[in-house]
């Protein structure tokens, strides 16, 4: 099996859960945002994803020790809503591995009757934006209208961006095949590989 999801803590009964994904990408906007939410809410780690399909490298942590890259799923109930957060150091690089990974995540999400998916990412610009705009695309019109209501979000993405690569895009497409409403929120950021899009993440 390419990807194995290990449960590391007990999961309470959940209903109509929402999955929020923020893995590394353009400007690391999604990762910065999700990691901040996890820390702020003190979300609890429930699952760890293991795979030999991850990049053949290690990361140096705050204690100056080497550790394998990881992807984890956290949980927190907020105002009677069950929220899951998908966070990690990396995402699968190869096309087939990315598909396999997303299918495994969706299998797990469906197992506890997940209702909706939100993916977070960036739109790379040629220079850092002063006031980053947030755009969205989704696999249904209904979820676009839901998130645009009372929020300053622009859904006119056609012709502005190319394909949405990686997990953030595939979860929308594969989610549609499973009738899971899914939306991607994309913030403007500087497109340089080493740039951290903190403004966009906010």
Please name every model-derived segment:
Residues 47, 84-86, 116-118, 135, ...:
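Hydrophobic/aromatic beta-strand patches that form the interior of the parallel beta-sheet core
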Residues 126-202:
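Catalytic cores of processing enzymes, dominated by hydrolases/peptidases
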Residues 93-143:
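Internal, conserved structured core segments that host functional sites
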Residues 23-29, 92-94, 122-127, 164-165, ...:
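Gly/Ser/Thr-rich loops at beta-strand to alpha-helix junctions
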Residues 32, 36, 104, 170-174:
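Alpha-helical scaffold segments in soluble metabolic enzymes
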Residues 90-95, 157-158:
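Surface-exposed cleft-lining segments at the edges of enzyme active sites
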Residues 1-90:
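N-terminal short beta-loop-beta anion/metal-coordinating cradle
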Residues 35-39, 102-104, 200-202:
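Short, solvent-exposed amphipathic alpha-helical segments in soluble enzyme
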